[in-house]
Amino acid sequence: MERICPYCMNILSEGTSCPACGKDPEAYRPASHHFPPGTRLHDRYILGRVLGEGGFGITYLGLDTELERRVAVKEYFPTAFVKRETSLTLNVTCYTDAGQVCYEKGRSQFLKEARTMAKLEDIPEIVRVLDFFQANNTAYIVMEFLEGETLKDRTARLGRIPA
């Protein structure tokens, strides 16, 4: 299997730094609940670095091996209900039986939103959903990857956006 840079998803040649982005792929250290770079999902997507993480999900930079393009892969991972130790398993597990009910309801809602977003492909202001699926006892949404500034970074730089 080819080595892929977790920062930019380009194929790595021999050497310590990526010829495309200049970063050292060995320097990337994911948290214990994040997938390690190179993890494959759905026999199609290879995951790289974490792009962002919130209370209900983790978004990874990915590579769609069929379309040979970078994508963003959002994983349903509500930290209030689930955990994963990637050294042991790729599956998420709920902390409690009571949390399992809330988790399953949230996962269903996550997939429902993915279906809705996939139908909105003609709206240029909304990122396109390319695929969605369930695996590892959770759900995933695969979206087009768009380069640019995050809303968080923009508001830090320019202040609040007027309504």
Regions of interest found by a model, annotated:
Residues Y28-L47:
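A short, low-complexity linker immediately N-terminal to eukaryotic Hanks-type protein kinase catalytic domains
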Residues G52, K112, E121-E125:
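Flexible N-lobe loop architecture of eukaryotic-like protein kinase catalytic domains
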Residues L47-G54, T59:
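Protein kinase glycine-rich loop
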Residues N136-T150, R154:
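Conserved short submotifs of the Hanks-type protein kinase catalytic core
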